[in-house]
Amino acid sequence: MSFAMLRPAAGRYLYPEISMLSEDEENGSESSGSDEKPFHLDADGFGIKAGKRRSGKKAGRLHREPRQRHTANARERDRTNSVNTAFTALRTLIPTEPADRKLSKIETLRLASSYISHLGNVLLVGEACGDGQPCHTSPAFFHHGGGGGSPPPRDSENSQPKQICTFCLSNQRKLSKDRDRKTAIRS
């Protein structure tokens, strides 16, 4: 006696009239909450004539969806291009060291925020700060109208490390380079 091993044929070959529902068709019916995909059985699969054929509606949707997708992709490309152009413009306004340093988007935003704070301090302090670092002026300067109050106690000054403003530091380096050049020229 001989036995033959048969593999089961794929369902799409045995039952070509059964197809998966698209997301639009699926959303029109109630969901059972399971992850199973519902199936659709064409009426002509059993020899029953249906009054309305779905293929015409489906074919129209297939032509419309790529066009909508292309326009959505074009809008997204335009939006991304606009955002990148704005970041490029912002990068040109922020001083960096070295000057040709490439900044990421998050670095650009953080440096822009820091630079705005620095410029605000420069406007508040003005030329009253002699060391070229308006961001390091003590809080008493701001509260008492120009440093007329007593300086803060030494203990509180030494308890926390001094914060360094990148832009003040950069400005201070430029000033010291200028002084060094002037000194070298005079010598």
From Swiss-Prot:
Residue ranges, compositional bias (Basic residues): 50-72
Pfam families: HLH (PF00010)
Region annotation Disordered: where it falls in the sequence: 21-83, 140-163
Entry-linked CDD domains: bHLH_TS_scleraxis
Principal subcellular localisation of the protein: nucleus
GO MF term set: DNA-binding transcription factor activity, RNA polymerase II-specific; protein dimerization activity; RNA polymerase II transcription regulatory region sequence-specific DNA binding
Keywords from the UniProt entry: Activator, Developmental protein, DNA-binding, Nucleus, Transcription, Transcription regulation
Domain bHLH: 67-119
PROSITE patterns cross-referenced by the UniProt entry: BHLH
Superkingdom of origin organism: Eukaryota
Gene3D superfamilies: Helix-loop-helix DNA-binding domain
Protein location: Nucleus
GO biological process: cellular response to BMP stimulus; cellular response to fibroblast growth factor stimulus; developmental process; regulation of transcription by RNA polymerase II; sclerotome development; tendon development
Bias (Basic and acidic residues): 34-43
InterPro entries: bHLH_dom, E-box_TF_Regulators, HLH_DNA-bd_sf
Tissues expressing this chain: Expressed in the intersomitic, the superficial proximomedial limb mesenchyme and the subectodermal mesenchyme.
Gene Ontology terms: cellular component: nucleus
Subunit structure: Efficient DNA binding requires dimerization with another bHLH protein. Dimerizes and binds the E-box consensus sequence with E12.
Functional description taken from the UniProt entry: Plays an early essential role in mesoderm formation, as well as a later role in formation of somite-derived chondrogenic lineages.
Protein name: Basic helix-loop-helix transcription factor scleraxis
Species of provenance: Gallus gallus
